[in-house]
């Protein structure tokens, strides 16, 4: 069957500052990573790329089932040359329709890459190929996790072995020869065997591993591709966040929202019997992670109330119960990442607040004759009564967090922050490769003032293309921090008067010790 399809290997090379001359896209109701708008005379055209081609492999890494932003990232990280294995559009659609194993196409027998004739690890009765790191949560049974740790001569790192059949580790998704990347959110790739053993022992009766399987690990080592923790699969975790969709009734949604004391964030309380909240599956003590697709983990009470109000007569909450919250905290992962790959019952995909563009040019920005003085910005923010006044967003699979919805007249606006600014440093620490939740934590722990080194989109692309490190010395000195007395909310279009005004179905009660709002 596979012999009727002939994938093509296209080797593209470009000059520094030049682009490859094509767009890499995902399109609605169309499968695969599509090649579009191949420019005449470009490296892409010279290499044989054609409009409608589907990309199967990048530098011999199979990418057909990977998330689009990861595929884009692989091309960008290839520098000035990249090898693409592509299949023309008609052949691709026929191959998908006849269920041809696309991974086998174009494989040369002499290659010693991933073995396509060997069954992938079997999980829950089906064949599962792991192409990304995965989180595995283990809770001891009978004083044992059901695995051992080993080191391999000539190889860096610690690996899983002696997996007990039907034991805790096996049930959690651990495979023999898995490479251990993290223990409870801490990277252990450079740790010794003894250090890793000690970390597992100190973890007590539960532990969270970030693992990658043997074949994928080998391939990433050969291709010198670094794993990004934010691309980890969450599918094996036993507890997951819940998306609760509600329509407002005559008496509101039927629950109270309270600021947590021991538990950070906003907590669901006092759900009315028969209310929209109860019928939708909301539970007492649920922690609110996101409102209508927007993270609220860093927001204060009134800001979250305002975001729910903005939804009108319906709202969507991403919530976690205490057990799920504790599990994600152990992994040092934000439950908000669940949004970014979650498939909903109707088949649609719940995207992150900053959705992947449908059209992405895979290139370094072309040189222009126009001279632009590209500079990063050093912005000093003094927290207002209710926050800094901006959203912090991230896209799964891409480095960096970026600014969205800067509130006019707020601390962020007055300090010079703008929508789409990429955060480079927080208080002098480079956070470009740090995951979203860690950047949030750095800003939260800054107290009443924070200094951000940011870069506008065009300037960021320019520095990346020229391979110029973005450092604070390139920026102009910051202005004096703005007056912190203004009541502006972090990550919310907030009116401090409206948040405390009683609506027909919403009441807000605030004191120095607690905040409690009926929804």
From Swiss-Prot:
One of its GO terms (biological process) is positive regulation of protein targeting to membrane. Signal peptide: none annotated. Residues 482-504 have a biased composition (Basic and acidic residues). Coiled coil: none annotated. It is a peripheral membrane protein. GO terms for molecular function: protein-membrane adaptor activity; signaling receptor binding. The modification Phosphoserine is found at residues 148, 192, 250, 334, 348, 492, 508, 510-512, 514. SMART domains: PDZ. GO terms for cellular component: apical plasma membrane; brush border membrane; plasma membrane. Keywords: Cell membrane, Membrane, Phosphoprotein, Repeat. Belongs to the NHER family. Interacts with PDZK1IP1 and ABCC2. Binds to the C-terminal region of SLC26A3. Interacts (via PDZ domains 1 and 3) with SCARB1 (C-terminal domain). Forms a heterodimeric complex with NHERF1. Interacts with AKAP2, BCR, CFTR, SLCO1A1, SLC22A12, SLC22A4, SLC22A5, NHERF2 and SLC17A1. Component of a complex, composed of PDZK1, SYNGAP1, KLHL17 and NMDA receptors. Interacts (via PDZ1 domain) directly with KLHL17; the interaction is important for integrity of actin cytoskeleton structures in neurons. Interacts (via C-terminal PDZ domain) with SLC26A6 (via C-terminal domain). A scaffold protein that connects plasma membrane proteins and regulatory components, regulating their surface expression in epithelial cells apical domains. May be involved in the coordination of a diverse range of regulatory processes for ion transport and second messenger cascades. In complex with NHERF1, may cluster proteins that are functionally dependent in a mutual fashion and modulate the trafficking and the activity of the associated membrane proteins. May play a role in the cellular mechanisms associated with multidrug resistance through its interaction with ABCC2 and PDZK1IP1. This is Na(+)/H(+) exchange regulatory cofactor NHE-RF3. It comes from Pongo abelii (Sumatran orangutan).
């Amino acid at each position: 069957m596979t012999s009727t399809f002939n994938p093509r290997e296209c080797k593209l090379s470009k000059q520094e500052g030049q682009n490859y001359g094509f767009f890499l896209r995902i399109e609605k109701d169309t499968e695969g990573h599509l090649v579009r708008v191949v420019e005449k005379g470009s490296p892409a055209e010279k290499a044989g790329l054609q409009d409608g081609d589907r990309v199967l492999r990048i530098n011999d890494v199979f990418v057909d089932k990977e998330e689009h932003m990861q595929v884009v990232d692989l091309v960008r990280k290839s520098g000035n040359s990249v090898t693409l294995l592509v299949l023309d559009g008609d052949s691709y659609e026929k191959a998908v329709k006849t269920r041809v194993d696309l991974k086998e196409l174009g494989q040369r027998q002499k290659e010693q890459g991933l073995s396509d004739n060997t069954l992938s690890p079997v999980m829950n009765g089906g064949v599962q190929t792991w192409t990304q790191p995965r989180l595995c949560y283990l809770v001891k049974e009978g004083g044992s996790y059901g695995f051992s740790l080993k080191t391999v001569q000539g190889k860096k790192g610690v690996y899983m072995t002696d997996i007990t059949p039907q034991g805790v580790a096996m049930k959690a998704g651990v495979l023999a020869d898995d490479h251990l990347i993290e223990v409870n959110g801490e990277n252990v790739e450079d740790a010794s065997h003894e250090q890793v053993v000690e970390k597992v022992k100190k973890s007590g009766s539960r532990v969270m591993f970030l693992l990658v399987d043997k074949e994928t690990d080998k391939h990433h080592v050969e291709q010198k591709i670094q794993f990004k923790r934010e691309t980890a699969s969450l599918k094996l975790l036993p507890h997951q966040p819940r998306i609760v969709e509600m329509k407002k009734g005559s008496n509101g949604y039927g629950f109270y929202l309270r600021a947590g004391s021991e538990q950070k964030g906003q907590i669901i309380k006092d759900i009315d019997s028969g209310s929209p909240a109860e019928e939708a599956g909301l539970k007492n003590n649920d922690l609110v992670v996101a409102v209508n697709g927007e993270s609220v983990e860093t927001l204060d009470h009134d800001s979250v109330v305002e975001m729910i109000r903005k939804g009108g007569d319906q709202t969507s909450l991403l919530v976690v119960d205490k057990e799920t919250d504790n599990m994600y905290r152990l992994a040092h992962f934000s439950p908000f990442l669940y949004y970014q790959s979650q498939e909903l019952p109707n088949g649609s995909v719940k995207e992150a607040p900053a959705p992947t563009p449908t059209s992405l040019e895979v290139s370094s920005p072309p040189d222009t004759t126009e001279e632009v003085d590209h500079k990063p910005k050093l912005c000093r923010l003094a927290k207002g009564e209710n926050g800094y006044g901006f959203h912090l967003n991230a896209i799964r699979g891409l480095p960096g967090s970026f600014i969205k919805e800067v509130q006019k007249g707020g601390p962020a606006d007055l300090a010079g922050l703008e929508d789409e600014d990429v955060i480079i440093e927080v208080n002098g620490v480079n956070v470009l490769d740090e995951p979203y939740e860690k950047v949030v934590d750095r800003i939260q722990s800054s107290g009443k003032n924070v200094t951000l080194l940011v870069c506008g989109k065009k300037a960021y692309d320019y520095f990346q293309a020229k391979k110029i490190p973005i450092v604070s010395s390139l920026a102009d000195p910051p202005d004096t921090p703005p007056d912190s007395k203004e009541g502006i909310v972090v990550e919310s279009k907030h009116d401090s008067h409206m948040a405390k005004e009683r609506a027909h179905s919403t009441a807000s009660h605030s004191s120095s010790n607690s905040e409690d709002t009926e929804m």
